[in-house]
């Protein structure tokens, strides 16, 4: 990132109770710090890699976000590749915290 002030507000939110029905992310989506109409996108990091550097970036719900082309460009610049989740039949896109914002029109990845 460049030094200096960001051109936008940046919010880092840690939510809880995903397994209990997305309670934390639903609460934030209903009570956002910045109106959702002004929210340009979000990144959900649900599980972090503890095994070291990898070449792939796994997208949950491939094809469901207009942020994917940007992610693909950034990944390519790092010598990485974007891949879809290995088991889409599990419906993880609809059971993860990003869905609370995505269903309200916020581009999420």
What kind of region is each of these model predictions?
Residues 5, 15-109:
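Metal-dependent peptidase/peptidase-like ectodomains
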Residues 1-7:
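Flexible, small-residue-rich helix->loop connector segments that border functional cores
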């Amino acid at each position: 990132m460049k030094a200096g002030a960001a051109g936008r507000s940046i919010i880092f939110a840690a939510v809880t109770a995903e397994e209990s029905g997305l309670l934390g992310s639903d609460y934030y989506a209903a009570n956002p710090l910045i109106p959702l109409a002004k929210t340009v996108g979000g990144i959900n990091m649900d599980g972090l890699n503890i095994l070291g550097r990898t070449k792939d970036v796994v997208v949950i719900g491939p094809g469901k976000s207009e942020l994917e082309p940007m992610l693909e460009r950034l990944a390519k610049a790092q010598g990485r590749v974007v891949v879809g989740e290995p088991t889409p039949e599990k419906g993880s896109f609809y059971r993860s915290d990003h869905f609370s914002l995505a269903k309200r029109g916020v581009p999420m990845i």
